[in-house]
């Protein structure tokens, strides 16, 4: 991934297996969120490829990448990106505009322990409750790939551990890749990647390899 100062983050031959959960650990600025954005098709690498289900996202137009992300990828953003003045149900049902079937919403909210909040405005929720709503919105699509950027960043360890457990348990066979700063959560995942070792910075270079 290239930056305006000519530097680059390089990820070489990273491969993620189906139906596995991955924790991405590493210091701030080591490229964890950048990797998620590459996998989501939000960013494009300066060189190399990003292949998901046999499709190279770098060969798709931005519109095609957006369509692929809507259909195949669930992204849980660090800042949630929920509409505060709308209810929990309305935030999830907005996905209908993108062709997503949300008929399983009640069952999913029940599994996440927030069905009672279905008709409550998001602005009235706690940080942990908003986190679960963001998870529900991502999982309602039954995505093949689930990306989570610091899904426990605003929570204490005990609450964060419960959220991670719920995320993994409700992934419904999808591959989960989650950024976390808390090494204590690592044992919850099938595999752990130390991004300080996986990614490297090059001054004046360009991104190489395949994700």
Model regions and ranges:
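Conserved ABC ATPase "signature" region
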Residues: 56, 100-117
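Catalytic Walker B motif of ABC-type/P-loop ATPase nucleotide-binding domains
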Residues: 146-149
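ABC ATPase NBD coupling module
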Residues: 57-74, 170
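Conserved ABC transporter NBD signature motif
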Residues: 48-56
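Conserved ABC ATPase signature
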Residues: 121-125, 129-131
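Helix-to-loop junction immediately C-terminal to a conserved catalytic motif
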Residues: 40
């Amino acid at each position: 991934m290239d930056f305006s100062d000519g530097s680059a983050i390089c990820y070489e031959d990273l491969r993620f297996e189906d139906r596995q959960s991955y924790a991405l650990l590493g210091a701030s600025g080591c490229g964890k969120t950048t990797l998620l954005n590459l996998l989501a098709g939000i960013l494009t690498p300066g060189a190399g490829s990003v292949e998901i289900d046999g499709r190279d996202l770098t060969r798709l137009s931005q519109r095609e990448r957006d369509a692929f992300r809507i259909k195949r990828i669930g992204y849980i953003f660090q800042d949630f990106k929920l509409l505060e003045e709308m209810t929990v149900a309305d935030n999830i049902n907005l996905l209908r505009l993108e062709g997503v079937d949300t008929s399983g919403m009640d069952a999913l909210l029940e599994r996440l322990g927030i069905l009672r909040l279905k008709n409550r405005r998001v602005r009235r929720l706690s940080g942990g409750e908003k986190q679960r709503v963001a998870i529900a919105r991502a999982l309602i699509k039954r995505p093949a790939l689930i990306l989570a950027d610091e899904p426990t960043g605003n929570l204490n360890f005990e609450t964060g551990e419960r959220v991670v457990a719920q995320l993994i348990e409700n992934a419904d066979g999808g591959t989960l890749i989650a950024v976390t700063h808390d090494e204590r959560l690592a044992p919850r995942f099938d595999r752990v990647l130390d991004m300080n070792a996986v990614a490297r910075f090059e001054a004046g270079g360009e991104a190489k390899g395949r994700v």
